[in-house]
Amino acid sequence: MPMTMSQAFIGNFLGNSPKWYKIAILSFLIINPILFFYVSPFVAGWVLVLEFIFTLAMALKCYPLQPGGLLAIEAVAIGMTSASQVLHEIEANLEVLLLLVFMVAGIYFMKQLLLFVFTKMITKVRSKILVSLLFCLASAFLSAFLDALTVIAVIITVAVGFYSIYHKVASGKDFSADHDHTSEGKNDDGENQLNEDELESFRGFLRNLLMHAGVGTALGGVCTMVGEPQNLIIAAQANWQFGEFAIRMSPVTVPVLFAGILTCFIVEKFRWFGYGAQLPDAVHKILCDYAAYEDARRTNKDKMKLVIQAFVGVWLIAGLALHLASVGLIGLSVIILTTAFNGITDEHALGKAFEEALPFTALLAVFFAVVAVIIDQQLFGPVIQWALNHEGNTQLVIFYIANGLLSMVSDNVFVGTVYINEVKAALINGQITRDQFDLLAVAINTGTNLPSVATPNGQAAFLFLLTSALAPLIRLSYGRMVWMALPYTIVLSIVGVMAIQSGFLEQMTQYFYDSHAILHHSVKEALAPAAAH
């Protein structure tokens, strides 16, 4: 029976998403104007925010750009906000968009160096606990200066490479042969060529390393203003530079970093939560043989490329630390330097670098449309007012927990943007002092970054890992990710709360003021970024 036009419409709408999801989005689009015009703009605004959070939470059913974008377009069309307000939000956060476009693409051209480093870690270090700590620390360090998505992308590339090499050799082929590593490894007679126990141990080993690395990106990403996109938004609103941001965050981020490393050690040592899987000796030998094979094939031209990438890496860290240019422009310089000196001049080769970041950049622009609705309809006014009625450290803890809970189910860039905008409005209205605003900015930043490791919804790097081609190969499901992240979620969240509740954050911030490591800011300075647009 031929498909009717209505069936064709539903079939095309949002592609391969489940039918119930398509109906839900269409229902949202019908309900929102009715609520806005006939019930209350405030209620309609909150419903829109919840619908948008729903699209983020269901990211595995459908990438949020399309459903979230439809909701945002309708919101502008019916008057919940204006196109000019959306543009204003995008203008105010232009640096974040440049970070995503240029920095992620720039690091793409440094992948060879990062692959080289992580490969050496696995092949040269035999202790599972030590290699886990190295992966966690290396990811944390890299994520403090690079985009977490890129760091995870590199580690995924390493893991896929190792998995395919093992699969190839275990299937009776040599390193240079073509092979489908996604196959079940059976021969022509249907017999299994692969040792099942060996393969399962190897999968477990890769799962462990990827989860440690994923949490490492959160541990490092929270420390600096370029570690995560929302950090840059918060830094811009507070008018902080790279060094000041790191210093202000340190009373929370340094204890959390040590707690995270200790957690990594403990779960590996006692083999809790699915950790402690060992790399079988036979697999280790295959990987070492392959690394030696690759080293022998590496020409002077290849070695020179690694040297260039290392020099560009030094420039990247120095440029960010000394704030020699805006983050996006430093990213652009990384693209130019690596491609120019490594001979990548083909337009198509350049284009591949931008594929990873642009969908998320477009999604971020949709975030800002929803933020514009929140501002115009004053949705968070009552919530913020309630939180601001509390005093001192309790107020900071409320903001930390509120950000943390929302970041577990929604994207932390969205959550961080909403809260810092609301707190800044409270500062401009004279409800809080500038020093309290700075402390709240720390609570918001750490709140969005740390508890969000709980689920793949909160951390873009985790979602990227879950939706990668590697996840099914190593049997990494949504539920398994949540379970393996649980010890980190509990420890990082509690240590973060304790650092704030105990007064340690406030005391250390005062110490930094007294020692002139940081200076007091004025309300006027906070207005500067907004006034510039």
From Swiss-Prot:
Catalytic activity, reaction form: 2 Na(+)(in) + 3 H(+)(out) = 2 Na(+)(out) + 3 H(+)(in)
Domain of life: Bacteria
Coiled coil: none
Membrane topology recorded in Swiss-Prot or TrEMBL: Multi-pass membrane protein
Transmembrane parts of this sequence: 10-30, 67-87, 98-118, 131-165, 209-229, 247-267, 310-330, 355-375, 396-416, 454-474, 481-501
Function of the molecule: Na(+)/H(+) antiporter that extrudes sodium in exchange for external protons.
Cited HAMAP family: NhaB
Family as reported in the entry's similarity comment: Belongs to the NhaB Na(+)/H(+) (TC 2.A.34) antiporter family.
Protein's recorded name: Na(+)/H(+) antiporter NhaB
Organism per entry: Shewanella sp. (strain ANA-3)
